[in-house]
Amino acid sequence: MSSSNPFVSIVDDDLATTKLFHEALSENIHNVRVVSFTDPVLGLEHFSENKDVYALVIADLRMPSLNGLELLKKVKTSNPKVRTILMSAYNFDEDLLFLKYMEEGIIDSAIDKPVTMNILFQRVTDELQASQLTRAK
């Protein structure tokens, strides 16, 4: 794996989820550097220091100190080319801020938890392909 490969970040305060997703993506998605954080503030700091080599940020909706919506808004404001996935065990359809951010392109995709690995891989692959197209422009 080259240090020029883009980052894919998983940010979820649940350590078991973070570890599972990190291992699964590291083993199955190639040509990326997978990093994971249980503290959204640390995840945002890493992104800020490396924002030009990020392809994708996957964030859980409900986290202490900085929720997924706030985190992904900061990510997109800092680098609009980075793709974003919001995941949650809660219903997105009634969250007006979520709907607004989807419409504005702050959130590129959403995943309902629990999620199968097949759905996770497909969504991540789709967003990485979109990232390559965006970064090529």
Where would I find each of the regions flagged by the language model?
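Active-site residues of response regulator receiver
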Residues: D12, D60
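Two-component/phosphorelay signaling modules centered on CheY-like receiver
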Residues: L15-V35
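Acidic, metal-coordinating helix/loop segments flanking the phosphotransfer/catalytic sites
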Residues: S36-L56
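Short amphipathic alpha-helix used as the core "switch/output" element in two-component signaling
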Residues: E45, L69-K81, K100
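Receiver (REC) domain active-site loop signature in two-component systems and cognate sites
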Residues: M63
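Alpha4 helix (beta4-alpha4-beta5 surface) of REC/receiver domains from two-component response regulators
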Residues: E70, N91-A110, N118, Q122
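Hydrophobic/aromatic residues positioned on beta-strands within the core alpha/beta folds
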Residues: M87-A89
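A Lys-centered signature of the CheY-like receiver
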Residues: K113
